[in-house]
């Protein structure tokens, strides 16, 4: 089993971490850089609204490396998570989203096996204690949600991963898939950016 313990994290930049993972090919690391960048706009797993660097005579800072976010475990500990998207492609064109279909930005997709391997490699090297995973919607909400569930399921059942997992529920996914995700994730969250129907029609006309 991958047994969790409490390492003294050295918050290195994403590139420094990746340079030390020799088993990963360059293509996977390029995709990871793109998808970690896209994931940073999801504020549900942000350290705080404050950017505060280390100062002489003071301990700590609020700035982690690329692809790393801070969250709080059930026991109150602040833990470091690999924060990444499965893909930043999306069938929707929501005006509020950086990853909307019409936006001109680098796109990438990690396979389930690639993301599982990345998580395990980072975890074994004590750079993270868990995973925060979200995704753009590809093909359909259920197709996308099923892939998120497969990542969590493979981590738990195949690799005996005992770290923290936070999954973002895909809007429109079936209740069955969301329930299955809850079997493997420590935390599930959903986006509620637009509480009124008229605002939804204005900003995301393809959703209902």
Language-model features: locations:
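Flexible, acidic/Gly-rich N-terminal and inter-domain linker regions that tether
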Residues: 1-89
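Residues in and immediately flanking transmembrane alpha helices
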Residues: 44-50, 96, 181, 199
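Short, flexible, glycine/charge-rich loop motifs used to bind or transfer phosphoryl groups or to couple energy/partner
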Residues: 69-72, 121, 178
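N-terminal, well-ordered alpha-helical segments
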Residues: 79-83, 92-95, 113, 117-120, ...
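Local cysteine-cluster metal-coordination motifs and their immediate loop/turn environment
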Residues: 88-100
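Short, glycine/polar-rich helix-capping loops at beta-to-alpha or helix-loop-helix junctions
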Residues: 90, 175-178
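Core AdoMet radical
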Residues: 100-115, 122-148, 154-175, 182-208
